[in-house]
Amino acid sequence: MATSSDRLVWIDCEMTGLDLAVDELVEIAVVITDFDLNVLDPGLSIVIKPDASALDNMNDFVREMHTTSGLIEEIPGGVSLAEAEYEALEYVLRFAPAARTAPLAGNTIGTDRMFLAKYMPRLDTHLHYRNVDVSSIKELARRWFPRVYFNAPEKNGGHRALADILESVRELDYYRKAAFVAEPGPTTEQTQAASATIVEKWTARMG
């Protein structure tokens, strides 16, 4: 039987900007996968109505982005922050009921997590403290396997949270197939040999 630790909780947020002191959430999407990246449900998308001051604080770039995506027109009809947190947490609990077991996943997820910690603390603390950040794998692939990086699926989520997070799942699925060792992976002997080689290489430097 699957447990909460077998799940990845994928979250993408749209904000009025990136300044945690003044900006607020305007959309959140949640998608749940297993560790084979199978999407377990179509996902949840919620538009949030922020304080007027946060909307007034949006710079031209962000306002144009949310206008082009159509989000700006939906914000006036959005739910409260409290309602959005409740709905998002209830959704996560369906698939990962045990607290602090399911990692948060996404792209440049540290930014989203900072906003979650401030504005949706109950959701944030339910998730494991570790993150699965696709952008980290992307940056390593760009330097170690350029062909893998440059042939990654093109992204066109249009800055809507649900489309963006599904693209992140797809992106990790691609890197898993293109950059990681194919299943069933290396043998125990191969991994032990690799570990010994790396330890020997770093022993002198680490004292």
Swiss-Prot record:
GO terms for molecular function: 3'-5'-RNA exonuclease activity; nucleic acid binding. Signal peptide: none annotated. It is an enzyme of class 3 (hydrolase). This is Oligoribonuclease. The active site is at residue 129. Belongs to the oligoribonuclease family. HAMAP family: Oligoribonuclease. The gene is orn. It is found in: Cytoplasm. InterPro entries: Exonuclease_RNaseT/DNA_pol3 (IPR013520), Oligoribonuclease (IPR022894), RNaseH-like_sf (IPR012337), RNaseH_sf (IPR036397). Residues 8-172 form the Exonuclease domain. GO terms for cellular component: cytoplasm. Keywords: Cytoplasm, Exonuclease, Hydrolase, Nuclease. It comes from Leifsonia xyli subsp. xyli (strain CTCB07).
